[in-house]
Regions:
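Bacterial N-terminal signal peptides that target proteins for export
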Residues: 1-8
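C-terminal motif of bacterial Sec signal peptides marking the signal peptidase cleavage site
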Residues: 19-22
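Short hydrophobic/glycine-rich mini-motifs in sensory/regulatory modules
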Residues: 149-159
Length: 218
């Protein structure tokens, strides 16, 4: 009986050890499935928001929006033949389309956001902000964008963050492209930037870069 109990104890110990190892392997496998990998699968599937893991991709952007206090957090991809692509030649002014939208009221899939200089800058690897603020329903926002990298080290999309800046823009309306006094800066800022405005540009760009790195393949 004692021998039987000892044998049973050994079997149970081995079974427990195997179970822990198996769980560990599953956790490691899940950790390997990062946001960037899922995004590549989304675009390659051609299924748009019917893609099985779309909700999980959006949920991650929702968390970012809630954590940092942005009005909108979303992802843009370059347009190719009317669809979002994983590659583009930025020597041309390629339009960008919205894909995963972490907003409370998301835009439709592949809405065309046109071309702006900061889209190209981010796609080429440099986090960049818009040259001016803009009017939102809840006040003024400043937008910034940063590259998200895939497994091969190439940019697969850009993360956009629209951050509220109404308090600052109230004192500098010329930095709001929707204001009658707008200074007209679109691609290059050729004048002096007030310290408070520069702080908004820098902080929004840093946010976009921080979260884009979190989404990138590790």
């Amino acid at each position: 009986m004692k021998k039987y109990l000892k044998l049973l104890a050994v079997v149970l110990t081995l079974a427990l050890a195997f179970s822990v190892t198996a769980c560990g392997d599953k956790e490691e496998a899940a950790a390997d499935e990062c946001w960037a990998d899922q995004y590549v699968a989304l675009i390659e599937s051609g299924e748009a928001r019917d893609f099985a893991d779309y909700d999980a991709l959006k949920e991650e952007l929702d968390k970012i929006r809630e954590e940092c206090g942005a009005n909108y957090v979303y992802v843009l991809s370059p347009e190719k033949d009317g669809e979002p692509a994983l590659e583009c030649d930025t020597s041309d002014k390629v339009d960008f389309l919205i894909t995963v939208d972490g907003s409370a009221d998301p835009d439709d899939w592949a809405v065309n956001y046109g071309w702006e200089i900061q889209f190209t800058e981010a796609w080429d690897g440099t986090p960049a902000a818009a040259r001016s603020a803009w009017d939102d329903e809840e006040g003024q926002c400043w937008s910034a964008f940063a590259p998200v990298y895939g497994e091969d080290g190439k940019v697969i999309c850009i993360l956009g963050i629209d951050y509220p800046c109404g308090d600052t823009i109230a004192d500098y309306p010329e930095w709001n492209r929707d204001d009658a006094s707008w200074n007209g800066f679109e691609e290059e800022i050729t004048g002096d930037v007030p310290e408070a405005v520069q702080a908004v540009i820098d902080s929004t760009t840093e946010l976009a870069d921080k979260y884009a790195k979190q989404l990138s393949h590790k």
